[in-house]
Amino acid sequence: MLFEELSLSKSIQKAVYEQGYTNPTPIQEKSIPLVLAGNDLIGCAQTGTGKTAAFAIPIIHQLHRIVGSSKKAKQIRALVVTPTRELAVQIGQSFDTYAKYTNLTQLTIFGGVSQNPQVDALKTGIDILIATPGRLLDLHKQGFIDLDHLHTLVLDEADQMLDMGFVNDVKKIVKLTPKNRQTLFFSATMPIAIRELAEMFLTNPETVTVSPVSSTAENVEQRIYFVEKTEKRNLLYHLIKNENLSDVLVFSRTKHGADNVVKALRKNNIAAEAIHGDKSQNARQRVLDAFKNKEVGVLVATDIAARGIDIDQLPFVINFDLPNIPETYVHRIGRTGRAGNGGVAISFCSKDEHGYWKDIQKLIKVDVQKVNDHPYPWHSGSPETAPGGSTKPKNSNRSGGAHKSRKSTNSKQNKKRWY
């Protein structure tokens, strides 16, 4: 399918083609017609699938028709709520790109900065508002935001908002909007708590699910270390010191695990910081800035918190914990090797994660280099003789990601994983 087959206005098509796009991605091809038809929508898609354009393009098309002449009064007709400043900025840039040849204006607001420029822009009048929950509610309470004329509400990265404790804020925001609004709900994963949230806000929604990319970048060198679980921190320190690694993004399966890795590295005089849902917006931004400015050599992140990280030149990614969803591995190591640069993706695999590694291998179909020459190998057994399949580590109940096996456990356990 071509973009020109989606019945979009000429001004939007021109902006899209200027970006070099002729064919919509699967999420765009499925979502854009449904949004244009006025349907509520649940979209399950990870970052990197073209999700933002899947809602930005049809919203711009609809509002361009509604607003028409630039003489018409500016009112907030589309609201995008997203959990972090980084994501809000990226979404705002997308709206600017695709609305380039329309008279629509967008404003991106978030906390941690002065509200005065944001208030000035709101007073001037805007068509599209992209906001983090806290700043949105704050400015609404002060009387600077009027949502009475809202046409479309987008809740983006819903699972991350849940992870960061924004559920009550989101509920408050939805109550401020007209009941006859169109609601678009996007999440990378769909655990029970997210599905319940969607049922509260949407009316007869259409559902679009897009599988993540399964292939890994050719310019990323992949290595796997089979290591005793209790020795992972020692191996991480060993690699950082002996191979002189810097600008390293380390993935941990849990927030608590991320904090513990940082503590262990700091004890060995390694400048490290963690980023996850329990940290405030300002704290996350400070950590990101320090990492980008090379004041911190190692950034430890959970999968959800890492979505807003956009760093072109990232030489090393380390999977301290293997993900329990194979596609997440592809997304993680795709953080390196960007913009024509090479990259190295290193993974640690303990015995109880071997099933995860087998599942990852089935997906990527790449012969990953096994590094046996290191101080912390398995005490007994070998990867070749270890059982395969989706063996779950004992603590897998605490891990993120939507997995079909969750349906066999009660909903209380499911919810605990996501709060």
Give the positions of each predicted feature.
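Intrinsically disordered, Lys/Arg-rich low-complexity segments
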Residues: 382-419
